[in-house]
Amino acid sequence: MGTPCHYALFDLQPSFRLDLDKLATRYRELAREVHPDRFADASEREQRIALEKSAALNDAYQTLRSAPRRARYLLAISGHEVPQEVTVHDPDFLLQQMQWREELEELQDEADLDGVGVFKKRLKFAQDTLNEDFAACWDAPGERDKAERLMRRMQFLDKLAQEVRQLEERLDD
């Protein structure tokens, strides 16, 4: 038995643009149906199947709710498998990465919580813009190479956003 498509689990068509609130609602509905606790009195086989379904559902949800993971998944199911670690060959974006990292280091060194908040808003805007660019690119035939480049940028910004959240938590303590 193969793993069903993440979109199929949620009765969705593969698309980058998703209503994340509806996705979360559907996830909660499905999670209740397959939760292993509901199968406590079932056979060992049924318990194992419930556990597998629950794990597959959780994985699908985590993938679809994350823009970079969703982009990577769409590329993969369309036959454009992308290796996890590939060097980005975009000088402008590499320069932007270095500038963001330097700015984040300065904010950390200065323990500037307000500055981190401003940085976080700019980063969110950059992520939203990149998500829109990917969505438009995804909807255009013949743009898979560009979509892959955009997905890599999305992954970087997502990682940077995680680092910003961690810094914010450290400075807020």
Curated annotation (Swiss-Prot):
Belongs to the HscB family. InterPro entries: DnaJ_domain, HscB, HscB_C_sf, HscB_oligo_C, J_dom_sf. The keyword Chaperone applies. It comes from Pseudomonas putida (strain GB-1). PROSITE patterns: DNAJ_2. Signal peptide: none annotated. It comes from the Bacteria. Pfam families: DnaJ, HSCB_C. GO terms for molecular function: ATPase activator activity; protein-folding chaperone binding. Co-chaperone involved in the maturation of iron-sulfur cluster-containing proteins. Seems to help targeting proteins to be folded toward HscA. Transmembrane segments: none annotated. Residues 5-77 form the J domain. HAMAP family: HscB. Interacts with HscA and stimulates its ATPase activity. This is Co-chaperone protein HscB homolog. NCBIfam families: hscB, PRK00294.1. Keywords: Chaperone. GO terms for biological process: [2Fe-2S] cluster assembly; protein complex oligomerization; protein folding. GO terms for cellular component: iron-sulfur cluster transfer complex.
